[in-house]
Amino acid sequence: MPETRTVERPGGRVVAYTSWGDPGGRPLLLVHGTPGSRLSRSPDPGLYARLDAHAVTFDRPGYGASSVHPERTILSVADDALAVADALGWDGFAVLGVSGGGPHALALGMRAPERVRALGLAVGGVPSDFIDPDDLIEINREGLRRVREEGRESLEAFLAEPAAKAASDPGGMLDAAMADAPPVDLEMLARPDVRTTIVESLREAFVNGPQGWFDDAYALTMPWGFELGDVSPSVHMWYGEADRNVPIKAVQKMASQLRVESFEILPGVGHMGWLLHEERVLRTLLDAD
């Protein structure tokens, strides 16, 4: 496993990050899903080298080796990401936000448009008020209901059981959370390379407890702190037609408020199926940089 490094943030916090691929390659910042960690990377171990990419992943606050940040917001995570880029000496870079990493990638584009040379979303999250809960898988539907009707404490109480499961049996937690996902997602999760990568990321995400997930999930359901129209870089978007984590109707509403460079709806694909197109997705961003 590659070396983990940290960058210090105000108040003595640290943000942990890991490099993959060629350190002299084209810079690519990958923003992991929810829950997740800096071990979220391609299941294809040779992909980054083939693309001449220096890919970097980082733990959002409370996940993995990054400190908890009680005041964390979508925008504060974007500032953490910029601190990682500074530590790497990156003046400009491509960014891909995956699932819950999507809003943070958009925030990064809003914060530093002069440095984000290409901005992509692969099944990236949408504003929660765009979502019809009936379009979601059970864990997301109930989590959103609790935030809307009962508040943060209820959300954390609901997530406590799957979080405990993730700490002891991340594979079991993954299976339980995705039990009512579309068949195409379950087929992807059955692939040993995909499953191993996701389970490793989940295990690391909860190594210091569940607070990272609690804070991350809550932040994603709240207003993001910026308007979609304030994101000046054009966005490349890849979404699954059958996704029940990020429903396509809500994605289309978000796209109508962004500057969209390209928007591809992947037919017959759920939340995980974008990985079938991963090399093309990353090449698009790196070649646009």
Features from the language model and the residues they span:
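Conserved HGGG/HGGXW glycine-rich cap/lid loop of the alpha/beta-hydrolase fold
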Residues: R13-S67
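Short beta-strand/loop motif that positions the catalytic acidic residue
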Residues: V231, M237-Y239, D243
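Alpha/beta-hydrolase
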Residues: I139-F226
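Conserved hydrolase catalytic core segment
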Residues: D91-D135
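Catalytic histidine-centered segment of alpha/beta-hydrolase-like enzymes
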Residues: N245, L266-L282
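Conserved acidic catalytic loop of the alpha/beta-hydrolase fold
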Residues: S76-A94
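N-terminal cap/lid segment of alpha/beta-hydrolase-fold proteins
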Residues: M1-S19
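Conserved alpha/beta-hydrolase "acid-adjacent" motif
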Residues: R244-A250
